[in-house]
């Protein structure tokens, strides 16, 4: 019974394959939706791709060209002869890649909706905040002994990325067109940027490439996760059977036979229900409370799994295993990037079961997180809000917008950062970042009106600064208008929000 259940778990649910993705490539609303989604994704992004030139007329010309013979086969000679295409060469490919990114995500969205319907789970309850990892670490830090991390192979050949989609998309026309587009785009840019075509492609098509890349990594991670769970259920496992698992993806139909082989001398190879795995910033990381020997076994199994079945070159010498104590006092995660930014302290919480009963002191682990000023200033400098040392400067590219639009853009950035770092224990660095954004906003407005900062502030008064208050500050000052000490104490408190599902653009500075 247990074996049959395991066999069912191995079968990937691909019943929701979509046969009608190809016609969507020629629909105008797909590219309009892709453009609007990219524009609204982050106010920080400069629209260097096609925002200023985007129009439905260009979309119609693009679709007309795609309807022509040979579809997307565009040679260098063709681009030189066609004046319109030569001028908008990168524009065409950028728009097509954004359209593909929308289309290939449709089957995955359908699977998510169907899974929610089958489980009858309210969608709001299914949200998972990336900040939930910090409360998780508070309970797990004292019990983890070793950490293994290694770089995931990158880049991967484009053909492998296309092959991954064959499991999810049962539409040969879409796959052929996708393969043709990738190779033509790659070859065309190889003429312009030799030896850097893959990096150029990734930079210009981040969402599309990351979707394909994550789909590829998910394939062998799903196998790895399954075996991690089974190592706990099948505690006494044959070493011969363990080797068979390396190729079990191609032997799903013989899964029962593999597990019903002769049970000879048992070897407890893997027995660790306390292993935790995470993929972060291109690294494969897993931690455990057991011995280094067990970690080495997991390491070489992951290498064999990737190399033998998925043809991914995982180099064992680049996967390092270190005592977890080295990371307990210096940890970088999700934008909290400074050294010693995470410290594990003991917090005493007093509780009383009944009135007039004795008090109980409960010792809890507290994970103190601080905002690192250097990476954030580097991100602000990259976005032209300040110079390299943190002095605010005006934003010339925004000077053509209206006053309300300029203020709204700065306020949104400021509030998003406050929201993202709301769980920080020490927010002095965050106050400096907010000061830089406020002064950069004032300098941008003064530049627009050809005035000085001092004169502009006198004319505008304190109304501008009030715009930068977050919702939390406004509520606190509304409840405690006179008790400034109480309001400051509450505002300095840590609040982890459960609706943060991606890393803030400024926090993800490289």
UniProtKB/Swiss-Prot annotation:
Its main location: plastid. GO terms for cellular component: chloroplast. The keyword Iron does not apply. Pfam families: Intron_maturas2, MatK_N. GO terms for biological process: mRNA processing; RNA splicing; tRNA processing. GO terms for molecular function: RNA binding. It is found in: Plastid, Chloroplast. It comes from the Eukaryota. Keywords: Chloroplast, mRNA processing, Plastid, RNA-binding, tRNA processing. Belongs to the intron maturase 2 family. MatK subfamily. Usually encoded in the trnK tRNA gene intron. Probably assists in splicing its own and other chloroplast group II introns. This is Maturase K.
């Amino acid at each position: 019974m247990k074996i049959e259940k395991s066999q069912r778990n191995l079968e990937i649910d691909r019943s929701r394959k979509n046969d009608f993705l190809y016609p969507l490539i020629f629909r105008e609303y797909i590219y309009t939706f892709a453009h609007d989604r990219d524009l609204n994704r982050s106010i920080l992004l400069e629209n260097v791709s096609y925002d200023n030139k985007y129009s439905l007329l260009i979309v119609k010309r693009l679709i007309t060209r795609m309807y022509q013979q040979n579809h997307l086969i565009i040679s260098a000679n063709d681009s030189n002869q066609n004046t319109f295409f030569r001028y908008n060469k990168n524009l065409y490919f950028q728009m097509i890649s954004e359209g593909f990114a929308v289309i290939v995500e449709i089957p995955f969205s359908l699977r998510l909706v169907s899974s929610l319907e089958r489980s009858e789970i309210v969608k709001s309850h299914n949200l998972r905040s990336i900040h939930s990892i910090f409360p998780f670490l508070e309970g797990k830090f004292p019990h983890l002994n070793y950490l293994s991390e290694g770089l995931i192979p990158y880049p991967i050949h484009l053909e492998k990325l296309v092959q991954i989609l064959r499991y999810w998309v049962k539409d040969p026309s879409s796959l052929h067109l996708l393969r043709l587009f990738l190779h033509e785009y790659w070859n065309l840019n190889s003429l312009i940027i030799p030896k850097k075509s893959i990096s150029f492609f990734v930079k210009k098509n981040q969402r599309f490439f990351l979707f394909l890349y994550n789909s590829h990594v998910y394939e062998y991670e799903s196998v790895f996760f399954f075996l991690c769970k089974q190592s706990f259920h099948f505690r006494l496992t044959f070493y011969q059977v363990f080797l068979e698992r390396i190729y079990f993806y191609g032997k799903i139909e013989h899964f029962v036979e593999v597990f019903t082989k002769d049970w000879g001398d048992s070897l407890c190879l893997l027995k660790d229900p306390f292993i935790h795995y995470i993929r972060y910033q291109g690294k494969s990381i897993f931690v455990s409370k057991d011995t280094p020997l067990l970690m080495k076994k997991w390491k070489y199994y992951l290498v064999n799994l990737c190399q033998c079945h998925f043809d991914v070159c995982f180099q064992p010498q680049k996967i390092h295993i270190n005592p977890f104590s080295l990371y307990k006092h210096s940890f970088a995660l999700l934008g909290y990037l400074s050294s010693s930014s995470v410290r594990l302290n003991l917090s005493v919480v007093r509780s009383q079961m009944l009135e007039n009963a004795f008090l109980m002191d409960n010792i809890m682990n507290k994970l103190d997180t601080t905002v690192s000023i250097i990476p954030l200033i580097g991100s602000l400098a990259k976005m032209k809000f300040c110079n390299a040392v943190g002095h605010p400067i005006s934003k010339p590219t925004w000077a053509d917008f209206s006053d309300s639009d300029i203020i709204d853009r700065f306020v949104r950035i400021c509030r998003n950062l406050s929201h993202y770092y709301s769980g920080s224990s020490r927010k002095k660095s965050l106050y400096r970042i907010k000061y830089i954004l406020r002064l950069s906003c004032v300098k941008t407005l003064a530049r627009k009106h050809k005035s000085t900062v001092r004169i502009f502030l006198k004319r505008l008064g304190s109304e501008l600064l009030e715009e930068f208050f977050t919702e939390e500050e406004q509520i606190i000052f509304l409840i405690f208008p006179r008790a400034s000490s109480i309001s400051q104490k509450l505002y300095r408190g840590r609040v982890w929000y459960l609706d943060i599902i991606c890393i803030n653009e400024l926090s993800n500075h490289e």
